[in-house]
Amino acid sequence: MTIASLSEVLQEAKKNNYAVAGLVVLGWEDARCYAETAEELKVPVILQAGPGCRANTPLPVLGKMFRYLAEQSSSPIVCHLDHGLSLIHI
């Protein structure tokens, strides 16, 4: 599967009356665990890269990491930049 948009995942969740977990990623191990668990449970997941993660992992690396996990998963994976502090982060 490819990266899913937050809008499509939340619309589906609202329509079918379920919540979607938004999980803060601190590194590769967390992200992989969240993606694998979402696939095992057959649910979507929102991977959130917050300031702590971005302090140690450059955005281009995070982007490739999230994209790789989404492509390997049969579950929808949303990539979310959590708490962008300035336009430079966008």
Show the residue positions of the predicted features:
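N-terminal amphipathic alpha-helix/helix-capping segment at the start of soluble metabolic enzymes
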Residues: M1-V20
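Glycine-rich, positively charged N-terminal anion/phosphate-binding segment
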Residues: L6-S7, W28-S74
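Hydrophobic faces of well-ordered beta-strands that scaffold small-molecule active sites
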Residues: A19-V24, V45-Q48, I77-H83
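Generic hydrophobic/packing signal
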Residues: A70-S73, L81-L85
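Conserved small/polar residues in nucleotide/adenosyl-binding loops
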Residues: I88-I90
